[in-house]
Amino acid sequence: MEQYLSLLKEILEKGQKKEDRTNTGTISYFGTQRRYDLSKGFPLVTTKKVHLKSIIFELLWFIKGDTNIKYLVDNGVNIWNEWPYETFKKSKDFNGESLADFVLKIKSDTLFAKKYGELGPVYGKQWRNFNGTDQLFDAIETIKKNPDSRRIIVSAWAANEISKMALPPCHAFFQFYVNNNKLSLQLYQRSGDTFLGVPFNIASYSILLAMVAQITNYEVGEFIHTIGDTHIYLNHLEQVEEQLSRKPLKLPKLVLNKKIKNIDDFKYEDIEIIDYESHPAIKAKVAV
């Protein structure tokens, strides 16, 4: 994953200090792009251990059109917990519960989860019901019937619903492209937390690309990752330096269940990353 390491270096070399919504502070560089050829291996960062389970379940959650964290926490995925917890803390029902207490209540109390586990009309809702349009289904059908179309786009950015979202979409929209019997996907991401979030985004959309390629009978091409505000949080600088000191290892392989022919039929056990070797995990705090 030299491309990813070069992205970290580019931000450090060209970026400027910038304040942000979380009051953490960043080094930010505007407008970056990296290309990942999936025929050369699955683009999963090897210079630190990445939590694959979270990536896969989150992607399945998007595809389901779900916007409540209960599905995630029930499956041991905790990457979205902080946002609804912050909303809960401002409610009249908050009695000093810790984040861990909040998550336990989401798991055990369906009514509580329905009320306080909701993130609003975020990714999954927009992918599958953008003002009544199932964008993901339409994109797949267009790939099958009109692969040369320049309109094979799925957008998570619904301007009229941004205020209702716990967090406006960072990975805002993506486009499919067919050429030489290969399917490629380009993602535009308005904001990229390059240490914590971007490795997830690269892997997630690469899996999605492989899924759609399989069900539309194309080979996998490239994942092209374009990011607007590409940043490293100031409290991640030590972790970034540690990661840059490590040598990348051989890329793993993605294996999908070949029997799956419909995007909605994929389950966790149908998606496997094999031969993944990595350096140890590097912990860092998410900015909320």
UniProtKB/Swiss-Prot annotation:
UniProt keyword annotations, A-Z: Cytoplasm, Methyltransferase, Nucleotide biosynthesis, Transferase
Gene Ontology, cellular component aspect: cytosol
GO biological process: dTMP biosynthetic process; dTTP biosynthetic process; methylation
Catalysed conversion reaction: dUMP + (6R)-5,10-methylene-5,6,7,8-tetrahydrofolate = 7,8-dihydrofolate + dTMP
Catalytic residue list: 170 (nucleophile)
The EC number(s) this enzyme carries: 2.1.1.45
Annotated localization: Cytoplasm
Binding-site list for (6R)-5,10-methylene-5,6,7,8-tetrahydrofolate: 51, 193, 287
Protein residues bound to dUMP: 21, 150-151, 190-193, 201, 231-233
GO terms for MF: thymidylate synthase activity
Annotated family: Belongs to the thymidylate synthase family. Bacterial-type ThyA subfamily.
Subunit record text: Homodimer.
Designated name of the protein: Thymidylate synthase
Organism of this sequence: Mycoplasma mobile (strain ATCC 43663 / 163K / NCTC 11711)
